[in-house]
Every structure is written in structure tokens, then in C-alpha cells.
């Protein structure tokens, strides 16, 4: 179990993604290297990269973190109660890109490795991650491209993984109180160890490496599309759903805050502008209504 190899991969992935996104945007990611004091309950370090006010990205963050703690927080043991009381080591890259143009979808990607340790037992490790797309104005060809790229990343590791991880994503990124999906999904996995460490790590790398091919062509095609105040207002309204999900349901956000993580890095996933309108409904037959009827309901995109 070579966690240093995982760390090296994650740092390189962060470099590659920020380089490509910066080239398309024309702006520069600011790097904020941080380290937790050894006296705090959560120890470790990380490297947050953020671009705000760009031509493409109104706000985009790509964070790397490598942290350790003496006791797993409740969010990490909810599905694994046998691990309660163990110490842990966690490392990962997480990103959220909130584009300025409403025709470019918001995108989220995360890959991570987790090790739960106890002095009198063997370490328990697993990988997690995935990526998902949140359009404001949907295009079938974009959704199909994104899902086909996810499917291709998983294909070498078993044909059953894509439909399994897609369903997991559809179930996970769902706002129960709204009875609607956050977006058009993608793939999501957690507690994954079934291929052995090396092969599971390879699968995680394949997912991480698929992010740029999945999202960048969509951004390149849509970022120059003309838009007005109507589209920006709808984008801000739908971003409100993103805020609701991240603060109420997201396991990564809850884990970070419960374990004493760095709030600025954890909350970089928040959109720069969002709003709420009481009982707002889209005009029937409008492009905004099409998001609800044609894109948010779970469906097969490949």
C-alpha cells in the first residue's frame, strides 16, 4: 500500500487540471499552501488553487489535501460503524468549476484515498471519487459526451462499474427535500477496495485522468455562447440548489467540517452568486422548463 504514490499522483493531477483550465480561461489560479498546526485534532497540509472573476470561470477551485486524525468523524463511519474510534489518513483532490456563462455547465470532480488505522489491527483502506455535471441549459450531446467519457474511464476495470457508479451518482446527488436531482449525474463511488490496492488505485487514476476530456470540450464549445440577464438569473437560482446540496447532504463537506478541516478550502465549492425565489416555476415550454423535464430526471445518456 503505497500512499506516497497516491499523493504524488494527486499533486500532479491538480497541476494538470489547473494548467488546462487556466489556458482556456486566460486567468491565473492563485495557490494557497496551508498546514494545520500539530496541536489541532486534524493535522496535515494541502494546496488550494482558486481562480475568481475569470473570463470562463466565475469561480473555480481545485484543492489538494492530505490530513490525519486520531478519530474518524461521524460522517466517515455512518456506513462503516466497525471503523468507529480508528485514526485515519485521508488525501484527495476535489474541484468545482462555476463558469460565468450559463450555457457552460458547472462541474465537480473528486478522487480520494482513505486509510483507517488502529494499533492492534491491519489498516483498512479504500478509494472514492467521481465526477458529475450540473447544466443550467441542457444539451443532449454534452450530457452524452460526459457520460461516455466516464464509461470509457471505467471500462478496463469491468463493464458493470459504469452502470453501478452512475446509479450511485444519481442516488447521491439528489436533493430529497426538493425531490429533484442536482444535475445530470455522472459517476460516484466510495469505499472501493474490491480490485486490490494497485488495481483500485489504477481505476481511481483513470477517473481523475478522464476529467479534462469529459468537461473541457463542452466548455470550449459553449463558453462563447451569447447570454443575457434572463440566463444569468436562472443560473443564480439553480446555483441555490448547489448550495443546498453541499451544506445539507455532501459527505465530503460534512467530513471536512466535522473533523476540524480548513473552512476556506472546504467551502471553495460554493458558487460566487446564488439566489432563492419563493415557489418559482419556469414558464412551460421554455428552455428553463426543459432542464426540469428533459435533463434532471435520471436517464440513460450513453
Curated annotation (Swiss-Prot):
Record Gene3D superfamilies: Coproporphyrinogen III oxidase, aerobic (3.40.1500.10)
Binding-site residues, substrate: 94, 110-112, 260-262
Source organism superkingdom: Bacteria
GO molecular function, one term: coproporphyrinogen oxidase activity
Main location: cytoplasm
EC number per UniProt: 1.3.3.3
Active site: 108 (proton donor)
Record keyword Oxidoreductase present: yes
Catalytic activity annotation: coproporphyrinogen III + O2 + 2 H(+) = protoporphyrinogen IX + 2 CO2 + 2 H2O
Annotated pathway: Porphyrin-containing compound metabolism; protoporphyrin-IX biosynthesis; protoporphyrinogen-IX from coproporphyrinogen-III (O2 route): step 1/1
Segments of this protein annotated with the region Important for dimerization: 242-277
Protein name: Oxygen-dependent coproporphyrinogen-III oxidase
Source lineage: Bacteria, Pseudomonadati, Pseudomonadota, Betaproteobacteria, Burkholderiales
Gene: hemF
